[in-house]
Amino acid sequence: MKIKIDSLDNIHAAAKKFLQNMGDGKVFAFYGKMGAGKTTFVKAICEELGVEDVITSPTFALVNEYTAGNGDPIYHFDFYRIKKIDEVYDMGYEDYFYGGNLCFLEWPEPIEDLLPEDCTKVTITVEEDGSRSVEF
């Protein structure tokens, strides 16, 4: 599936479309260059799920936990600064990835060997006109 985001004005419509088409998946790995909009898109998805917390990139915390409107936890990861895979083992990644709750992962490249088999890979691309394409 491919979703086009022309501007920030329609990012919530794109997030709704993503949610309508994401299936039963729980773990989503977001790929894209720096500045492609991974955090912005995850933020819009979380807002559409009823998260009222301030949603930020967990670059330094590694993981942020939010509460969806239905009370379920949502986990937002950023693996950009991972230096050693042991850091991911130490945080107990299996509890998150296999716990049955939504997990949104930015910069998953350093931990690809640990991703669940049913992880959905989402690629955000900056198009020549400045719009974004979200493919999954």
Spans of features found by a protein language model:
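Phosphate-binding P-loop
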Residues: 19-25
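N-terminal pre-Walker A segment at the start of P-loop NTPase domains
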Residues: 1-17
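Conserved lysine of the Walker
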Residues: 38
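Hydrophobic anchor at the beta1->P-loop junction of P-loop NTPases
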Residues: 28-30
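Short beta-strand-centered segment that lines the nucleotide-binding/catalytic pocket of NTP-utilizing
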Residues: 51-66
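The conserved Walker
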Residues: 34
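Short phosphate-coordinating micro-motif centered on Lys-Gly-acidic
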Residues: 1, 47, 86-88, 94-136
